[in-house]
Amino acid sequence: MNEAKIRLMLEAEKELTLTLTENERFMYFLGRMQFLKYESGKENLMRSDCSGSVCLALLLATGCSIRVTADALYRKYFTVRNPDRNSIRCAFFITNYDRKLGSRLYKENEVAHCAGLAGEDVVLNCVEPRSVLRSLSDLRPVYYGMDYRIEVRGLNKKALLEANKSGKDLFGPDAEFLEYRRIVSENKVTDPSTSSGAL
């Protein structure tokens, strides 16, 4: 997708999300990503993996850019236990034993999957072949049966702001994500009475 198309799309999204809170924007953009083609290592509005969808929704909702694994999201950014329902939240699927998924070996207690909360008991489950909105209650028995435990955590906004400022957790983002990041940073809200300023 070229820059002109990305700008046009993001301008339309800006109009739609102007009056929403950060949490509402996060949920909106997760919903917007339903039916994306799953592709490992991607994070754009056409293709994404699980952590990429959360990182992209964070960028578009808050204006802060990170690109990390599901495990890093859990350990560094979504550290608030028992989060408020009006906060940005994510479900994490933690393996109970060492397991190989594709070419990757996940160690016991490592997060192998994540899904951002797009509503009450609704997550964007970004898996092959396409991402889809699912009930977390429906996913729980499936993942419990595969020996995962699930934890819902809230965003630590301070950690996100610090990482965005330092640029330290931006590993291997695709070209589209970098373009979204550039456009979002150009359009940041400057009114201090509003939220931090994404689209």
Give a label for each model feature.
Residues 1-37, 146, 155-199:
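Intrinsically disordered, low-complexity
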Residues 7, 15-22, 63-160, 168-171, ...:
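...with weaker cross-activation on analogous glycine-rich loops/strands in unrelated enzymes
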Residues 25-70:
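Secreted/periplasmic proteins that engage bacterial cell-wall peptidoglycan
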